[in-house]
């Protein structure tokens, strides 16, 4: 009986710790932090699933894996550019004399979230393609939703 209670308490402590970490992360980084985390997870899963798909076909090579990592590094650069673009736009909106005392609203940024969403949909589409290359059936409607999400972010 006591062992069961300890297992339940351990599970409750683990749930409380996860909830506390998620709350602290949200307090520190807000919804944008979760978007960045989702993008990073998608990048990692895409690289892993791409490597697995290549290995399943007997086509894995360290050169191709390195090229994939460089591709991901380029994406990080683009996300940094988007973040800096939002920062510059925010400073301009709040401080340029042409706007007087600003434009009367807070500019929290739109470039970075749109770039992140576009990359997330791109990565998810690639992950689905990798899964199909490994032999997993991928519903056509899922592929269409991912394509529409990417197109929507491009507009």
Predicted features along the sequence, with ranges:
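Alpha-helical transmembrane segments of multi-pass membrane proteins
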Residues: 39-49, 75-86, 115-126
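Hydrophobic alpha-helical transmembrane segments and immediately flanking/interface helices
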Residues: 91-124
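Transmembrane helix interruption/hinge and helix-loop junction motifs
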Residues: 27-35
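Membrane-helix exit/interface motif
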Residues: 52-59, 80-97
